[in-house]
């Protein structure tokens, strides 16, 4: 008897512990217990999970949002733990309850789990258990339940009978007309996915009137979500129907009084273009695109500017060049000198992509003048976006033409009297070098990079040093050995001590990317020579450099060449030299 009692106690243990933990004052403990629900369910078995655990969770969970969110997430994966699809209906009550709470993230997760569980029901069980849940949510007093209802239509509709389908369409219409904006917003958000499962006949008779109504809502937050639905609906209809049923509303959205709605149209423009096809694009979308490119709101212009390349790429190939030249480029020219830097930057990130579409002649005639303006723009992002995408143009017109047209502008910027402009070009140089290739770089740009090392502004010299490291990473150590290290080593003999210091700074960073052989053979001898420099600043930088490059030297080299030099510097007459020498000796010993 005692053994029998013990087995009963053991079987009750998981649920008892769960109850205790869920009543604990510590939120973290409650959260952990929810995350272990599947383990507890396995211990209880399917029947007791259905008869004890699920009712307990349904009745007693009123907790912090974090705990409720974890519960909503767990229950979505619980079907197998309650006995499989034929018992999935047991999960509906707790999830329905969670779908009505105040916190949006909890509701959204509950709806996500409800959708998962609903899909696991048989068609018959769906009508018996899930559809009534949906209808209760639709007629709930609080807007929270009605917003959650919107997410369930598309999973229920395809598998129910015709009379129930009619009810669901009527319920959805009711939500589209709800007095609360949050509910209408949720309906607009789910309209597109619902449209995908509704028969074409009812899409036209029921859902498109809902779409038109939502697109005219007095709240712009509802109208902008209707724009997303527009894409889905346009994809589902034949061209004639799109023209008559969707386009009037789309035109209205493109010229909406709220910039947020127009912004959404701009964001979705290429998706809309793909949905409506080339003929409607040519007749209707090109004018709408032009309208948005001239929008009064900079946010809208920036959004549509980022779509210029993709919109043009998806134009009908027969008319593509003609449409770009006559209908798009005149507006793009205006954006090149837009007063807003975000708009100019957005355009600069895509404009080079027009080059392959227009071909060599039109690129030279039409696009290069715009690129030159953008290369000289005061906004660094604009210049960077042009330089970063030069490969598109290079592929079309070739390096020769590109260098003749754009290189003078780059050189001009590299030698600009404003040091910040010079700095910007230095920062773009690795990207530029990568696009133009090593041979071109050596011919046209290497001299510029070396010149920056001798700039009178320290920030430029510092940036130029880091630039050298990035170039070696790009082109490799053998290139560095041939192309730049000899020129840098010459600086160690310059009469101006600042040049000798820059030489040391370069050797510091080059050791990291050139490896042991080059560091030992080429870099170290020059550093050691500068240990006898007459200027104390150079000598203490030798000490710092020796410490910095020591990880890239063999131990025997450190013992034979580095340590004797540092010992000598440690007896220097200058206090700073002695300090940094001692620091280097200690640093190398500790390594």
Swiss-Prot record:
Compartments reported by the entry: Nucleus
Function per UniProt: The PR65 subunit of protein phosphatase 2A serves as a scaffolding molecule to coordinate the assembly of the catalytic subunit and a variable regulatory B subunit. Key mediator of a quality checkpoint during transcription elongation as part of the Integrator-PP2A (INTAC) complex.
Residue runs in coiled coils: none
GO cellular component: centriole; chromatin; cytoplasm; cytosol; FAR/SIN/STRIPAK complex; INTAC complex; nucleoplasm; nucleus
Tissue: Expression varies in tissues throughout development. Highly distributed expression in early embryos. In late embryonal development, found at high levels in nervous system and gonads. In third instar larvae, found in brain, imaginal disks and salivary glands.
Organism this protein belongs to: Drosophila melanogaster (Fruit fly)
PANTHER family named among the record's database cross-references: PROTEIN PHOSPHATASE 2 (FORMERLY 2A), REGULATORY SUBUNIT A, BETA ISOFORM-RELATED (PTHR10648:SF4), SERINE/THREONINE-PROTEIN PHOSPHATASE PP2A 65 KDA REGULATORY SUBUNIT (PTHR10648)
Similarity comment: family membership: Belongs to the phosphatase 2A regulatory subunit A family.
InterPro entries in alphabetical order: ARM-like (IPR011989), ARM-type_fold (IPR016024), HEAT (IPR000357), HEAT_type_2 (IPR021133), PP2A/SF3B1-like_HEAT (IPR054573), PP2A_Regulatory_Subunit_A (IPR051023)
Pfam families the record matches: HEAT (PF02985), PPP2R1A-like_HEAT (PF22646)
Residues the record lists as N-acetylalanine modifications: 2
Domains: entry comment: Each HEAT repeat appears to consist of two alpha helices joined by a hydrophilic region, the intrarepeat loop. The repeat units may be arranged laterally to form a rod-like structure.
GO molecular function, one term: protein phosphatase regulator activity
Ranges of the HEAT repeats in the UniProt entry: 10-48, 49-86, 87-125, 126-163, 164-202, 203-241, 242-280, 281-323, 324-362, 363-401, 402-440, 441-479, 480-518, 519-557, 558-591
Protein name: Serine/threonine-protein phosphatase PP2A 65 kDa regulatory subunit
Gene3D superfamilies reported for this sequence: Leucine-rich Repeat Variant (1.25.10.10)
């Amino acid at each position: 008897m005692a053994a029998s009692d013990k087995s009963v106690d053991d079987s009750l243990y998981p649920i008892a512990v769960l109850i205790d933990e869920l009543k604990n004052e510590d939120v973290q403990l409650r959260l952990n217990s929810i995350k272990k629900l599947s383990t507890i369910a396995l211990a209880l078995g399917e029947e007791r999970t259905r008869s004890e655990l699920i009712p307990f969770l349904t009745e007693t969970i009123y907790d912090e949002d974090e705990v409720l969110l974890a519960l909503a997430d767990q229950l979505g994966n619980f079907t197998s733990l309650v006995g499989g699809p034929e018992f999935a209906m047991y999960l509906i009550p707790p999830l329905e309850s969670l779908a009505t709470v105040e916190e949006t993230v909890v509701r959204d997760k509950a709806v996500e789990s409800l959708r998962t569980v609903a899909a696991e029901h048989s068609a018959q069980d769906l009508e018996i258990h899930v559809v009534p849940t949906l209808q209760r949510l639709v007629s709930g007093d609080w807007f929270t339940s009605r917003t959650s209802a919107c997410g369930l239509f598309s999973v229920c509709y395809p598998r129910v009978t015709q009379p129930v389908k009619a009810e669901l369409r009527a319920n959805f219409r009711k939500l589209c007309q709800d007095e609360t904006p949050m509910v209408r917003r949720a309906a607009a958000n789910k309209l597109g996915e619902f449209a995908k499962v509704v028969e074409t006949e009812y899409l036209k008779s029921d859902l498109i009137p809902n779409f038109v109504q939502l697109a005219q809502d007095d709240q712009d937050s509802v109208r902008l979500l209707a724009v997303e639905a527009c894409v889905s609906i346009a994809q589902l209809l034949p061209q004639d129907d799109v023209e008559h049923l969707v386009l009037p509303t789309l035109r209205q959205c493109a010229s909406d009084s709220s910039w947020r709605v127009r912004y959404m149209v701009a964001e979705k423009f290429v998706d809309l273009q793909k949905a409506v096809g080339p003929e409607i694009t040519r007749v209707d979308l090109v004018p709408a695109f032009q309208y948005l490119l001239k929008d009064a709101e900079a946010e809208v212009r920036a959004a549509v500017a980022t779509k210029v390349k993709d919109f043009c790429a998806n134009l009908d190939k027969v008319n593509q060049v003609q449409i770009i030249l006559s209908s798009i480029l005149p507006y793009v020219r205006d954006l090149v000198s837009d007063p807003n830097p975000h708009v100019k930057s957005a355009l600069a990130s895509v404009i080079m992509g027009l080059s392959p579409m227009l071909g060599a002649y039109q690129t030279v005639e039409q696009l290069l003048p715009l690129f030159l303006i953008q290369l000289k723009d005061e906004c660094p992002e604009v210049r960077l976006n042009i330089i970063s995408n030069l490969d598109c143009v290079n592929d079309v017109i070739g390096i020769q033409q590109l260098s003749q047209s754009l290189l003078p502008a780059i050189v001009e910027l590299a030698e600009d009297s404003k040091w910040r402009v010079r700095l910007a070009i230095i920062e773009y140089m690795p990207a530029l070098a990568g696009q133009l290739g090593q041979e071109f770089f050596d011919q046209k740009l290497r001299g510029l990079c070396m010149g920056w090392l001798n700039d009178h502004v320290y920030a430029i010299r510092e940036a130029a040093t880091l630039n050298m490291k990035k170039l070696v990473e790009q082109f490799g150590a053998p290139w560095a050995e041939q192309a730049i290290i000899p020129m840098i080593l010459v600086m160690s003999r310059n009469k101006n001590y600042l040049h000798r210091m820059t030489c040391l700074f370069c050797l510091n960073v080059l050791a990291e990317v050139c490896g042991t052989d080059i560091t030992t053979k080429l870099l170290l001898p020059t550093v050691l020579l500068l240990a006898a420099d007459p200027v104390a600043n150079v000598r203490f930088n030798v000490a710092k450099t020796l410490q910095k490059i020591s990880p890239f030297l063999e131990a025997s080299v450190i013992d034979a060449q580095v340590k004797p030099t540092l010992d000598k510097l440690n007896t220097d007459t200058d206090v700073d030299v002695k300090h940094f020498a001692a620091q280097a000796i200690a640093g190398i010993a500790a390594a």
